[in-house]
Amino acid sequence: MQAIYRSWDEAVFSDYLTRLAVPADKKFKDFSRGMKMKLAIAVALSHSPRLLVLDEATGGLDPIVRDEILDIFNDFTRDESHSVLISSHIVSDLEKICDYIAFLHRGRLMFVEEKDLLYENYALVNMTKTQLSGMPKGSVLGSRENSYGAEVLMLRSDIPAGMVPERTTIEDIMLYMAREER
């Protein structure tokens, strides 16, 4: 790899191989998808990068290995000059390591927001179908009707007095916004 990367650090690479339990005596063609991903991450981190661009970096990995890799990314970003741009369908991974989250749905950017502000600004509200039909246009960001009424995603600032907001998750926000787009 020294021929490819000017700042290649063999010692760092060796440390990552050990930390990620990548076998040195196995041929690459015999690696599982997870082992190939761990090797790719070790390579990516072993040449003094400032930015990692990762597509489904933890996909196909068991939860223990995923958590270990997320810890490595957290360690990497402790240096203020380092960043990670990660694309993932595993929302819990994003919740663990991201400061900002962008949500793309069918080629449309639905939001880019600081993670903590997503929790602070959005809420789910249970209401009747009649209450839902009377909500001002634009205040309902997404809804799911059921036999009891409706569960509605709203900005906390748009929730009418007397209605009780419930904490939402980032996955809920994404699902409700995507549902409203249909």
Predicted regions and their residues:
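ABC-family P-loop ATPase nucleotide-binding domains
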Residues: 1-39
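Catalytic Walker B motif of ABC-type/P-loop ATPase nucleotide-binding domains
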Residues: 52-56
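Short loop immediately C-terminal to the Walker-B catalytic DE motif
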Residues: 58-59, 91
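Helix N-cap at the start of a conserved alpha-helix in ABC-type nucleotide-binding domains
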Residues: 63-65
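ABC ATPase "signature
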Residues: 112-113
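C-terminal coupling/interaction segments
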Residues: 140-182
